[in-house]
Amino acid sequence: MREQLDQIRREAAEALCAVDTMEALQDWRVRILGKKGVLTGILRGLGALPAEERPLMGALVNEVRAELEFKLEEKSRELKAREKEARLSGESIDITLPGRVQPVGGKHPLTLVIDEIKQIFLGMGYEIAEGPEVELDYYNFEALNLPQDHPARDMQDSFYITSDILLRTHTSPVQIRAMERIRPQLPVKVICPGRVFRRDDDATHSPMFHQVEGLVVDKGITFGDLRGTLLTFARQMFGPDREIRLRPSFFPFTEPSAEVDISCVICGGGGCRVCKGSGWLEILGSGMVHPRVLEYGGYNPQEVTGFAFGMGVERIAMLKYGIDDMRLLYENDMRFLAQF
């Protein structure tokens, strides 16, 4: 059996040298090392040997198997390298061809509008202030001159977590925090972008939406400063021909207060279906900061005045891009979002 094993080793090695394809190498492996291969047959025949010879012959068979498996791996690497070299030598690459342009994503329309609003007010010397979305009742209501019995404090309209902690219903609390941080220095000149939460859900309202509010506090601030600021914003956001109109209104944290309209972005003020024939579209609320709010912020209303304004980003985006249903902004439909 030893002579037979030596012959198998020699013939298998010679046959392996003649192999020149991966298919032929696989055939060689099955014939020599496979379950029905030559070496397996030798192992099965060990039972016919005397008991004292079996361990020695078994060790010799395993030695031959290990040697042939090593040569098999070497041959496999050699053939793979040869095939790769042949494939590369047969291919040609035209380096003058243009590269493949990878598709790139785009910003969400709300992000585009928020970024544009930020740039407009940064250009006017404002800084960006931020605050927590989970807010204390004190900052969300009390410090903004909203009394305990105000409808906005109804738990049916706001998302309360505990009796004195809720999801903020506007970004106005950031104005109080900004005044507390900056006092007693002047001026205070900030915008406060962020998410807010209310119990609304229809074509023009969402339980979560975005606001940008602004605050200016300094000596000698007038309503004229407010109007000039908002006119500048409207013309930079909607075009140089836009006009604004201020209508008397009421907000607990400003006095006097005004709703702000712009001349219709569709008809230019002539009257159309979008503006319902009025020529005007409402965009935000504003007013002079209430003296009590100044006091809560740590300023003396006898020495300083200020103005504030607040806008819904979704409203601005709908007007700017002609979107008629707010819910489109949150449905993640790529056919819609890819337009921006």
From Swiss-Prot:
Cofactor (UniProt): Mg(2+)
UniProt-listed InterPro entries: aa-tRNA-synth_II, aa-tRNA-synth_II/BPL/LPL, Phe-tRNA-synth_IIc_asu, Phe-tRNA_ligase_II_N, Phe_tRNA_ligase_alpha1_bac, Phenylalanyl-tRNA_Synthase, tRNA-bd_arm
UniProt-listed Enzyme Commission number(s): 6.1.1.20
GO molecular function: ATP binding; catalytic activity, acting on a protein; magnesium ion binding; phenylalanine-tRNA ligase activity; transferase activity; tRNA binding
Cofactor binding description: Binds 2 magnesium ions per tetramer.
Location in or out of the cell: Cytoplasm
One GO cellular component term: cytoplasm
Annotated residues for binding of Mg(2+): E255
Keywords attached to this entry: Aminoacyl-tRNA synthetase, ATP-binding, Cytoplasm, Ligase, Magnesium, Metal-binding, Nucleotide-binding, Protein biosynthesis
GO biological process: one example: phenylalanyl-tRNA aminoacylation
Predominant subcellular localization, coarse grouping: cytoplasm
Gene3D superfamilies assigned to the protein according to its UniProt record, in alphabetical order: Bira Bifunctional Protein, Domain 2 (3.30.930.10)
Catalytic activity field: tRNA(Phe) + L-phenylalanine + ATP = L-phenylalanyl-tRNA(Phe) + AMP + diphosphate + H(+)
Subunit relationships: Tetramer of two alpha and two beta subunits.
Family, as annotated: Belongs to the class-II aminoacyl-tRNA synthetase family. Phe-tRNA synthetase alpha subunit type 1 subfamily.
UniProt cross-references to NCBIfam families, sorted A to Z: pheS
Protein name: Phenylalanine--tRNA ligase alpha subunit
Gene name in the database record: pheS
